[in-house]
Amino acid sequence: MKITQFVFGLLAIFSPAVSAQQNHIVIENTNVRYCISAQGRNISFIDRASGVDYLKHDTTSACALVRCSDVEYPATSVFLVNGRLTIEFSEVNVKAVLHVESLNSYIRLTVESVSGDNIESLMFLNIPLTLKARPDESFGSCALSLNLITRVNQLPALQTSLQALCYDKFGIEGAKVAIVATPTEKILTTLKQVLTEADEMPHCIVAGPWANDVPFNHGSYLFNFGSLTESNVDEWISTARKLGVTQIDNHGGRNFFRFGDFVLNHKKWPQGWDTYRSIVKRLHDAGIGSIFHTYAFFIDKQSKYVTPVPDKRLDAFRTFTLAETIDSNDAEITVNESTSGMSTVTGFFEHNSVILHIGDELITFGAVSQEPPWQFTNVKRGAFGTKPASHKKGAKARHLKECFGLLVPNPNSSLLEEIARNHADIVNSCNFDGIYLDAIDGSSILRGPDECWYWADKFVFEIQKHLKKPVGMEMSAMWHHFWQFRTRWQAWDYPQRGHKRFIDIHAASVNSGLLLPLHLGWWNFQQFNPPQVEPTFPDVIEYLGAKLIGWDAGISLTGAIDPDRLATVPLFRRAVDTLCTCEELRRSNVFDERVKAKLREPGKEFSLFEDKSGKWRFRPAHYDSHTASLSEPWSLSWKTWNPFRKQPVKFRIETLMSAGSYYDANNITLADLSDLNQLTESQRSADGITVSLGETSNGPNGSVIFSAASSGKVPRNAAWARLDRRFSPCLNLKEHKAIGLWIDGDGQGQIIAIRLESPRHISYGAVADRYITVDFTGPRLFTLIETESARWSDYVWNDGKGLYNLYRETIDFDMVESLSIWYNNLPKDKQAKCIIGPVKAMPMVTCTVKNPVVTVNGKSIVLPVEMQSGSYLQFNEGNDCILYDSKGQILCRVIPNGDIPMLSAGENQVRFSCDAGDGSVPRLKLTVISHAEPF
């Protein structure tokens, strides 16, 4: 490698007319000049072409820091001689020597030596920048780690701060980083050069800085969970072509292949991976790529590493010592060490197991003592096909690690590398085109969250080292070293409600500084399944398709698209057709950047249509939804907004589920706030919020005055207070999924939220929220059924919840652990004061909407039809009015009575009515639709 030496050295200016501030160290190449004072403080980081200094000057920053005995110390002096930068930390008598190489397109720093006592870590690069790490900036910079022991926290390719660390536990000497600073348009080219010249890491020339050059990385894919066999390859090829996807993701587990040892289900693939090699070849011949999808280093409990003889390289939380000998039939195990705090709670995301490893036997336990004698009881011997045996006093019992229902290799053993090689062997043998390392977001189970970067990176390095050809990767997490092996960014799991808002949040979270091809995720389709799942109506899919085109992002479909489902659920078939069209339009690059910019605007909706010339076009659309119930007369009249020109109204009516009577004796009372003993915790609230409960004689028995006031310390949408009740044992609300609530409102505009939760290990932290906006005064009785999602994102809750908890996961109504009653959006310096009656769980029941009437600005249209819960009516224009069942099957065409009402530009008054029946109270959602001219 040819190294060009540029100016770098100690500039000692001896003229007394020159300020001592000029006595500093300069490290530079053709693009950037980095200046450090002799005292180790950053002075500047200058783009040599423009003269702009990108160093962040709001605070003084040290060029390096050392951590000793858990205290961090800044550099106190630096000097540069013959390409060696010596950094001293006089407060702790530590010295580090860096080899500095100024190359044509980047600068390389290597830690050559370090001396001192109690050194835990060394940050040998620290340059805070004013850059925003956006691709629209003219200048970009990146610190790129050049080996496994060098930690860089920020992701490539564009960064806001350049830092590099190394640790005593992994090795300090030899840590190495590249400083890249260049015009943004050249950053990927430069990073290609850096990685090509990096000799301590595997190379993958189809990922990272090369990713955008590879068509495969821009594709979309279809999931295969084990149904693709030799006998149906042609069907899969046909389906893929119909869907417009060019890849198949082969997701292991279940009845496909085991994680860890990757043994295929021999009933389906009798020749093992030899069979699958021929499947992949047939897909390749048809122009379809294949991805090998695993749960990273996690290990199936039926794998060879577990049964019949458990591998001693399986990792454990801790090790116990048998206090007495046990024979092969004993159902209790006594140990010397404390078992206090241990639990039998396990679940998908839980870091816990009920498995003990003693000798060559695995044992599960059903209970564990919290006080002496320390015992595991209700044990089952010879678990997972191991052999029960006697074990002597003093034998070691290891409590095995588990997450995602899978076991874990000890990362300090050879098993981590062995499983990595297993990946490479399968990919090499079958000629897979990509690897998806799912579950690697669980890497904290190895050695804690602060070491994820090292062990996860090590695992990826080991796979890449053994591949025979460059194979790119996707992963369920992201650390710095992953970027150079990553082909695309940012697949998320699909939402089950709040679809459009979720898409916008997903797109907004895209880290454009990664400069990788985009992927907007794993999608599935839903049909009517209340109260926690919302159907994916055509406008949802058009919204998704528009964003895919706008962002030039791929997509993947996880299920619901096999031929049988598409045949029996026309709603899904229409969704697939729309996505297929959008995918073809995206790949063909039909729309220019001006149109794409419109399509990717958050919240902006579009309808896709084919014009008379056969050309696909988008037109701006607006969907304004409102839920109404005949039992809530205030809900039957409302205002809707049309942002476009005056036009005939279009709408969709969805018949929802209803509920029984609030006063039914068979309801389950979830909270009677007049009984303060029901509250399991004291009231909680945001900063500056005061809360009180008061007695009242108004309202149903058990009513209280719930008061709260905000002093304004937090924004209004973050002004919350909550009351909580826990149920032990959990409540079974399987037949009581609706909520009834009586409220005497104060008209202050706050929201009241009713939240149900199941145990975390069962429902992954999901919540079932229902909201009421208190924009009214006086008493009202509410029936709450459908759970919230999008509106949760309008407020700050400080509840530790994330998007998946609200948009994706569902609670288990069979096991409801808690109820919370919230205020949020409390006004400043005003007391919110509502009377709240008992919160009741009520049965959901079906209802009928008969002969609905939609009135817009005083003009009505009557729809002579009966609609059952789950059905929906789509009225477009003229006589285009169709009633569908919950699967999207056409039930009948409806001929409306009356002239079509006109939507005015701006605000419009809407009213709904229908014939009353003998059954449950009709409930519905009416969505008013308007359009602008196409573009």
Residue ranges and their predicted role:
Residues 693-721:
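Short carbohydrate-recognition loop motifs
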Residues 27-252, 270, 282, 286-290, ...:
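Carbohydrate-recognition beta-sandwich/jelly-roll modules
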Residues 215-319, 401-424, 428-454:
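Aromatic-lined carbohydrate-binding/catalytic grooves of carbohydrate-active enzymes
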Residues 296, 300-381, 385-388:
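Autoprocessing Asn-cyclization modules and mimics
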Residues 710-807, 832-834, 922, 926-935:
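Extracellular ligand-binding interfaces
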Residues 122-125, 648-651, 662-668, 673, ...:
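Extracellular beta-strand ligand-recognition surfaces/modules
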Residues 305-317, 401-418, 462-566:
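Glycan-recognition surfaces
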Residues 335, 343, 381-389, 393, ...:
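Intrinsically disordered, low-complexity segments enriched in serine, threonine, and glycine
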